[in-house]
Amino acid sequence: MADSSFDIVSKVDRQEVDNALNQAAKELATRFDFRGTDTTIAWKGDEAIELTSSTGERVKAAVDVFKEKLIRRDISMKAFDAGEPQASGKTYKVNGTLKQGISSESAKKITKLIRDEGPKGVKTQIQGDEIRVSSKKRDDLQAVIAMLKQADLDVALQFVNYR
């Protein structure tokens, strides 16, 4: 019998983030408490999002609106990292970044967790920014997925290529 396997990745669907950003921009433009504050939200490069407003509290509220839209689109908050408001002239800015991929440090932590607490006979292999998990039994792989979903890790995980 051949080994079964799956890959652990940390990727964010950019289209879903774009939809959340557009919904947040629409809400910021129409909400009464944001009128007259020049609050904007926009992409800044491929992985960064910039929020600007005239006051520090309004820019924090704009971050909360954006996070709410991300949650509604099933995007984990672990995948979005918002900085602190920074004053620049008459406006306040928050730069947020999307976290893509599993860092080598996080990958080592995940493989150690699988080795220590997972079922015996499960093999892990780090392949760049993803982890391949293989075993002879599919039940063992499902147990690993359940264990990782329960674990408190600092990255958003998705499980793909389950074979």
UniProtKB/Swiss-Prot annotation:
<dbReference type="InterPro" id="IPR035570">
    <property type="entry name" value="UPF0234_N"/>
</dbReference>
<dbReference type="InterPro" id="IPR035571">
    <property type="entry name" value="UPF0234-like_C"/>
</dbReference>
<dbReference type="GO" id="GO:0005829">
    <property type="term" value="C:cytosol"/>
</dbReference>
<dbReference type="InterPro" id="IPR036183">
    <property type="entry name" value="YajQ-like_sf"/>
</dbReference>
<dbReference type="GO" id="GO:0000166">
    <property type="term" value="F:nucleotide binding"/>
</dbReference>
<comment type="similarity">
    <text>Belongs to the YajQ family.</text>
</comment>
<comment type="function">
    <text>Nucleotide-binding protein.</text>
</comment>
<dbReference type="InterPro" id="IPR007551">
    <property type="entry name" value="DUF520"/>
</dbReference>
<keyword id="KW-0547">Nucleotide-binding</keyword>
<protein>
    <recommendedName>
        <fullName>Nucleotide-binding protein MAP_4063c</fullName>
    </recommendedName>
</protein>
<dbReference type="Pfam" id="PF04461">
    <property type="entry name" value="DUF520"/>
</dbReference>
